[in-house]
């Protein structure tokens, strides 16, 4: 059962569900909360590798996959007044402005905006589930499948999240996992481990 707008407001008021900054009531719609785009983007650079080998990246000593991030990607931060252009065929990572903390008995579902999708913007490539016990900003996996560059601006409404009540509290929520690699994330770093 998904939470309706009234229930979302109650959960926020009781701090059972935490969204920072707290959304105004006009951003809580029916069964979703609108999410805004932050100002951090991770772009994929041109590189000389013939392919990406997840086994190799996963096996780096001490999971030093950060070298992969810095050799093949670059995180940029723009001001609130700047624009970011996503060109056709490009994949870029970005973040929601909001940090979200989900309790152990809820699961979140991220959706892109239909009006943006009609111009070719995919907001999340595959990962739209936000696990029970999650805390942090949500990474967005933008892809422009259209024919023209798409202009993105910090603070624009980029998608929405809904919340579904579980039958009980999870016994293995995300925040209690030993390998919760993205817990409390505030950046777009790619951490490759436990893939193979």
From Swiss-Prot:
**Reactions accelerated catalytically:** dCTP + H2O + H(+) = dUTP + NH4(+)
Q: Does the keyword Membrane apply?
A: no
Q: Which positions are tagged coiled coil?
A: none
Ordered alphabetically, the record's keywords are: Hydrolase, Nucleotide metabolism, Nucleotide-binding
> Membrane: present as a keyword of the record?
no
State its Enzyme Commission number(s). 3.5.4.13
**What are the protein's GO molecular function terms?**
dCTP deaminase activity; nucleotide binding
Q: Where is the active site?
A: 141 (proton donor/acceptor)
Top EC group = hydrolase
Free-text function comment from the UniProt entry: Catalyzes the deamination of dCTP to dUTP.
Q: Which family does it belong to?
A: Belongs to the dCTP deaminase family.
Q: How does it assemble?
A: Homotrimer.
NCBIfam families associated with the record: dCTP_deam
Q: What is this protein called?
A: dCTP deaminase
The organism encoding this protein is: Wigglesworthia glossinidia brevipalpis
């Amino acid at each position: 059962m998904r939470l309706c707008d009234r229930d979302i407001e109650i959960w926020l008021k009781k701090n059972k569900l935490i969204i920072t900054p707290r959304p105004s009531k006009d951003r809580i719609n029916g069964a979703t909360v609108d999410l805004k785009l932050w100002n951090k983007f991770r772009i994929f650079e041109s590189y000389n590798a013939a392919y990406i080998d997840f086994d190799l990246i996963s096996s780096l000593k001490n999971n030093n996959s950060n070298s992969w991030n810095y050799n093949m990607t670059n995180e940029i931060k723009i001001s609130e007044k700047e624009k970011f252009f996503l060109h056709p065929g490009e994949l870029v990572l970005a973040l929601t402005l909001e940090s979200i903390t989900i309790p152990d008995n809820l699961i979140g579902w991220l959706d892109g905006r239909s009006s943006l999708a009609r111009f070719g913007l995919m907001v999340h490539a595959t990962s739209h589930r936000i696990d029970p016990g999650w805390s942090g900003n949500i990474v967005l996996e933008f892809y422009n499948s259209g024919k023209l560059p798409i202009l993105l601006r910090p603070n624009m409404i980029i998608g929405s999240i809904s919340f579904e009540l579980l039958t009980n509290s999870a016994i293995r929520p995300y925040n209690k996992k030993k390998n919760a690699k993205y817990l409390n994330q505030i950046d777009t770093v790619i951490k490759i481990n436990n893939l193979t």
